[in-house]
Design a protein with these regions (language model features):
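C-terminal catalytic subdomain
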Residues: 101-104
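Non-catalytic beta-strand/loop surface segments
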Residues: 1-38, 49-99, 120-128, 142, ...
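Double-stranded RNA-binding/processing signature
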Residues: 41
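Scaffold signal of the M16-like zinc-metallopeptidase fold and its non-catalytic homologs
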Residues: 76-81, 108, 135-165
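Short beta-alpha connecting loops at secondary-structure transitions
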Residues: 89-90, 113, 158-162
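A common structural junction motif
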Residues: 67, 106-116
């Protein structure tokens, strides 16, 4: 068991704009979330899949295909024994400002806070996760890596319960974690801009 001090709770939004010699502007957003051993971890993981895993995911469908505000966008979580982050990163389409891009992402996050996820949409994400887990366990390296991870957490016997934990996530839980995490004061925003010469 590690005994490291926890980062103090963030009480106001953090923002940074950086200009570099890069080909395209990029938007990076991050929100503090729980550690892997917290029950809400599974809800955050499902939220990230709901937002960006596959062509029918919300961010891809709404912001890339329909509104064409982004050329690419991704949502993912990072977290282990310590508290993690919910990340959203994307490259706005030509002519779209980083401010417009951020506003569009915030709109999608607010939707998650205000409206429960449709049961059919939630079931689809859970099924995709379950099939990934099952097919992943065909590979011995994946099984060994997962077993090592759960042993690090001190609960190797729980590895077999992982799918059940994802299956147990409800639309109400998704809405609750979205409301708690996607608050402005809990966010870190980075505008990574193309340097104008």
């Amino acid at each position: 068991q590690r005994n490291l001090p926890q980062e103090p709770e963030q009480t106001e939004e953090r923002r940074l704009t950086v200009e570099r010699n890069v080909p395209l502007d990029s938007l990076f957003m991050a929100y503090h979330m729980c550690s892997h051993d917290h029950p809400d971890y599974y809800a955050f993981d499902i939220l990230s899949d709901l937002l960006s895993n596959g062509r029918s995911s919300r961010l891809n469908q709404h912001l890339v295909q329909q509104k064409q505000l982004f050329s690419s966008i991704d949502a993912y979580i990072s977290g282990s024994v310590d508290a993690g982050l919910f990340h959203i990163s994307g490259k706005p389409s030509a002519g779209v400002s980083l401010e417009q891009a951020e506003a569009a992402v915030r709109e999608e996050l607010e939707r998650l806070q205000q409206e429960p996820v449709d049961e059919q949409e939630l079931e689809k994400v859970k099924n995709k996760f379950e099939s990934t887990q099952i097919f992943g366990n065909i590979n011995y390296l994946n099984v060994a890596t997962n077993l090592a991870w759960f042993e690090l957490l001190g609960r190797a016997e729980d590895m077999e319960k992982e799918v059940d934990r994802y299956r147990a996530v409800t639309a109400g839980q998704l809405q609750r974690v979205a409301q708690s995490a996607f608050r402005q004061e809990n966010g870190v925003i980075l505008y990574y801009k193309k340097q104008v010469s």
